[in-house]
Amino acid sequence: GPDTLFPDVKQLQAGEYIFVEDTVNGLNIKKHKYYQYAHNYPASITEEELIAEHDEVVLNIFNRLIQIAAGRTIVVPLSGGYDSRLIVLMLKRLGYDKVIAFSYGRPGNSESVISKQVADRLGIRWEFVEYSNDLWYQWYHSDDYKRYASFADGCTSLPHIQDWPAVWRLKKDDRIPSDSIFVPGHSADLPAGSRSASVPELYNNESIDPRRVDSTILKYHYSLFDWTKRREELEPLFINKIEQTLGNDEQFPDNASAFESWDIAERQAKFIINSLRVYEFWGYDWWMPF
């Protein structure tokens, strides 16, 4: 929801805007929601039509990216996933050569192995930043990290740190141009149905069941700490917040649509997309294709 660490301070959320009017009685502030994700299903469409439509959309996206990049180097955090692989593939397809891919972690990790294989196949320059326990200790206790944590949380989100040291090293070692634009593959997997593997019980075309959606959100997204000893106290509070975020159940055709809508608003917008603060902190532009 709109809450922050400060009870009297609220945040503007994804799909919302604020209208501020200066009146004789002071400022009149109104918040409006203009968009909420809810997937629906076409009445009739063939697989061939879907593929053609998808290709048209993707071509439009990456032609726009090339215009925005305007000759600058595009830096792609290339993992083993399909999202980032699609980015480098489309840039290759459209003939944009100023591309650098990078990966990070322990040497030989599976993500970086696939990353290098893809970059080599496409003839793209590839950079690797090694991680280790000792290096993480140094990074985490640095003054730069303290500044980043303060910069990136917005009093509402966890600072994303996974690739923060990698971008730091790429910058400090002059391995990428100072005017580079970072293009990650964030969030493309969600509308493609990635959650169907994690919570298949919701992907069965059943009509909306709010209790089932609420319990699945709690199970999937609130599992990193043990709050079972306070379940009777906390669960009603969490469920109330979840239902406030989802709004009217009738807008969703099924459980999966409601589950993904909450994920888009609360996980993607406030955590995954908040990882873009990494690039901003180190002085780089970014662009999201998906």
Indicate residue ranges for each PLM-predicted region.
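N-terminal segments that mediate ammonia production and transfer
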Residues: 1-45
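Core structural elements
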Residues: 19, 261-276
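ATP-dependent adenylate-handling active sites, centered on carboxylate activation for C-N bond formation
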Residues: 22-24, 36-255, 275-290
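Shared catalytic-loop signature of beta/alpha-barrel
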Residues: 258
